[in-house]
UniProtKB/Swiss-Prot annotation:
Protein name: Ribosomal protein uS12 methylthiotransferase RimO
Taxonomy of the source species: Bacteria, Bacillati, Bacillota, Clostridia, Lachnospirales
GO biological process, alphabetically ordered: tRNA modification
Entry-linked InterPro entries: Elp3/MiaA/NifB-like_rSAM (IPR006638), Methylthiotransferase (IPR005839), Methylthiotransferase_CS (IPR020612), Methylthiotransferase_N (IPR013848), Methylthiotransferase_N_sf (IPR038135), NA-bd_OB-fold (IPR012340), Ribosomal_uS12_MeSTrfase_RimO (IPR005840), rSAM (IPR007197)
Organism field: Lachnoclostridium phytofermentans (strain ATCC 700394 / DSM 18823 / ISDg)
Start and end residues of each MTTase N-terminal domain: 1-117
Task of the protein: Catalyzes the methylthiolation of an aspartic acid residue of ribosomal protein uS12.
Length: 440
């Protein structure tokens, strides 16, 4: 019995996919990379924004075609789209044989058995349920880095975001389970752990009554084989001195923080339901750069939010110029049904959203190149990710670069390097968002 699996959306969704793959493999099913020969296809979906929703629907319909042309006996849809649009999917896509909600992935093998038995079925647990399933995750990222999801859900309820309704309230994974999972990943060859959640900085508050991310980091740093630990999805108002101290004192933790701020205008931040303001953001970023001079800061912004005036946009542009983020992504606002922002007046046209996005990225482009040029001559520790077609050129990442979202360094060397290997590289040239260097 062959199973083909597609994982869409964010890295948090990917972790769910890897857990399901582990359960499927442990059950004795064969995993295949060829959808045309699959008996069962599982699509783990995303619907965070409109484009993600469309991609998920199109993928489901594309896979459904194999019921006509292939050996497909069952099509299973899991994840956020299944959670949010259960009734619509069942009514409008008859080719779908089963649905699993965002908290039901531990039931995947049971659902597969039912589908193979000819049953159309579904599995939905309480949205605040936290699975305790233990499995040997299938690492799909190449084996040398992996995401560690430390919590599920979110309590922030930003006005543009549907996640709390789909994923439930914030639930921290018990620390002992995370340490056990990290050890398992390390034993499998993982050298870089990337901590993720809808928000990482309040980890532990629900379980232990206080923020426990610093303590978790210390325990993870003690695991043999792990060389890099990277933290993503930090809410700015939750970053405290203890977290900064751990970043400074633990050498395995990359001097890199992903801090999605979304905007810099106080009016827009308030409309978004964000719990910070321009002055606090400037104070935090200034402090981080003072305490950790080589820190690389990544952020993401939303442009074209309802009610965003030209003045708000100019405030954001000036903020980007002054803060000079090492890494930055800009997204146009996506109007999501059942969110407060979708009901707001003064919705911005797509043309204006895209124009403002372009202006911000042009500013960041110049900053990124200047920052890249400043790295020329420096020696950096680089994780090798693979080899390019050209002989002697490898691609890797520095501590400043998270996989899939940041830049790369192209490494020239006479040696034969392996994926996951760490080498010292001298930067010789700067590109727009990438670096070029040599390894002796």
């Amino acid at each position: 019995m062959k199973i083909f699996f597609i994982s869409l959306g964010c890295d948090k969704n990917l972790v769910d996919s890897e857990v399901m793959l582990g359960l499927i493999r442990d059950r004795g099913f064969e995993l295949t990379n060829d959808e045309s020969e699959a008996d069962i296809i599982v699509v783990n979906t995303c619907c965070f924004i409109h484009d993600a929703k469309e991609e998920s629907i199109n993928t489901i319909l594309e896979m459904a075609e194999y019921k006509k042309s292939g050996s497909l006996k069952g099509l299973i849809v899991t994840g956020c789209l299944a959670q949010r649009y259960k009734e619509d999917i069942l009514a409008e896509i008859p080719e779908v044989d089963a649905l699993l909600g965002t908290t039901s992935y531990d039931a995947i093998t049971e659902v597969i058995d039912k589908v193979l038995g000819g049953e159309r079925t579904e599995s939905f647990k309480d949205v605040d349920y936290l699975s305790e399933v233990k499995t040997n995750r299938v690492n799909t990222t190449g084996g040398y880095y992996s995401f560690l999801k430390i919590a599920e859900g979110c309590d922030k309820h930003c006005t543009y975001c549907i996640i709390p309704k789909i994923r439930g309230d914030y639930r921290s994974v018990p620390m002992e389970r995370l340490v056990e999972e990290a050890k398992f990943l390390s034993e499998g060859g993982v050298k870089e752990l990337i901590l993720i959640a809808q928000e990482t900085t309040v980890y532990g508050v629900d379980l232990y009554g206080k923020k426990m991310l610093p303590e978790l980091l210390r325990k993870l740093c003690a695991i043999d084989g792990i060389e890099w630990i990277r933290i993503q999805y930090c809410y700015p108002e939750e970053i405290n001195d203890e977290l900064i101290d751990v970043l400074k004192s633990e050498t395995k933790i990359c001097h890199y923080l992903d801090i999605p701020i979304q905007h810099a205008s106080d009016d827009i931040l308030k409309r978004m339901g964000r719990r910070t303001n321009n002055e606090e953001l400037v104070t935090l970023i200034t402090k981080l750069r003072k305490e950790i001079p080589d820190i690389a800061l990544r952020t993401s912004l939303i442009t074209g939010f309802p009610g965003e005036t030209e003045e708000d946009h100019e405030i954001l542009k000036e903020f980007v110029r002054k803060m000079r983020f090492e890494r930055l992504g800009v997204f146009t606002y996506s109007k999501e049904e059942d969110t407060p922002a979708a009901k707001m007046k003064d919705q911005i046209t797509k043309k204006v959203k895209v124009a403002r996005q372009k202006e911000l990225m042009e500013i960041q482009q110049g900053i990124a190149f200047e920052r890249a040029e400043s790295m020329v001559g420096r020696k950096l520790k680089v994780m090798i990710e693979g080899k390019l077609v050209e002989d002697g050129i490898f691609i890797g990442r520095t501590y400043m670069d998270a996989p899939n979202i940041d830049g790369y360094i192209f490494v020239h060397t006479k040696d034969e390097l392996m994926s996951g290997e760490f080498v010292e590289v001298t930067v010789t040239e700067a590109k727009e968002y990438d670096l070029i260097g040599t390894a002796e």
